[in-house]
């Protein structure tokens, strides 16, 4: 799978015997659970960095899948990737975006700042799932799925993409609903006067609608500031590769 040889066996982990396969890469052999699509690099990271229980957000994994799909299409258009491999990567990325491969991303969020482990986790899952669908070893995690990319441009791009989608799909609609509710409450409570408080003591009178208007204005300004951040978030680092020079990326 993913260009590695493998065979079946059993190993004991935390008192439980598990079926496994053995994958080999440039760093040696790794025993990987037989029923998952990740490979040697993911397994190595999983075993060496068991820090905390927090996993990568599913939104980020889906964003990485979208970027891998876009890269496959771009590499095909540039003559770097053949049609069959392009279509295979696209098919698996669609499965990933639909959440059908969610059980294949076990790594902690506590990892290198470049997100190399998770980038390789996604590469391995796409390659191994694609090879399973093809019935032969067609996709390599680095040579095909990660073609023209680096963790240093893909991971920050995925962060931007995940943030934009989360803002547009959930946060901004929720803020719009909250603003509407506050505006309604502001109108409903006109004429009601209450005691304002400062320093945990009664201070001066204030209209309840005036108080609510402050909450509404704060929410509206926050929403406007979030919307103003979107154009910058839509600028992606893709194409910069490892150190920003674009090395190994076709132009």
Predicted features, each with a name:
Residues 2-17:
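Short, Lys/Arg-enriched N-terminal segments with co-localized hydrophobic residues
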Residues 17-251:
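Conserved, well-structured ligand/cofactor-binding cores
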């Amino acid at each position: 799978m993913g260009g590695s040889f493998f065979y079946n066996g059993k190993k004991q982990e935390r008192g439980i015997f598990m079926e496994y396969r053995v994958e080999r890469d440039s760093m040696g052999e790794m025993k990987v659970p037989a029923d998952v699509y990740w490979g040697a690099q993911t397994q190595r990271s999983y075993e060496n960095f068991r820090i905390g229980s927090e996993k990568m957000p599913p939104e980020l994994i889906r964003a990485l899948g979208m970027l891998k799909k876009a890269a496959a299409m771009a590499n095909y258009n540039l003559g770097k990737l053949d049609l069959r491999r392009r279509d295979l990567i696209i098919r698996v990325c669609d499965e990933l975006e639909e959440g059908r491969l969610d059980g294949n991303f076990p790594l902690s969020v506590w990892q290198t700042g470049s997100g190399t482990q998770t980038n390789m986790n996604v590469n391995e899952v796409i390659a191994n799932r694609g090879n399973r669908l093809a019935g032969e070893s067609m996709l390599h995690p680095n040579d095909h799925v990660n073609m023209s990319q680096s963790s240093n441009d893909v991971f920050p791009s995925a962060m931007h993409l995940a943030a934009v989608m989360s803002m547009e799909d959930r946060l901004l609609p929720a803020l719009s609903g909250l603003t509407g509710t506050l505006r309604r409450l502001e109108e409903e409570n006109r004429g009601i006067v209450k005691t304002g408080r400062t320093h945990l003591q009664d201070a001066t009178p204030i209209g309840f609608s005036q108080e609510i208007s402050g909450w509404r204005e704060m929410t509206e300004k926050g929403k406007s500031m979030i919307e103003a951040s979107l154009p910058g978030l839509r600028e992606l680092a893709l194409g910069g590769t490892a150190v920003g020079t674009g090395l190994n990326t076709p132009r």
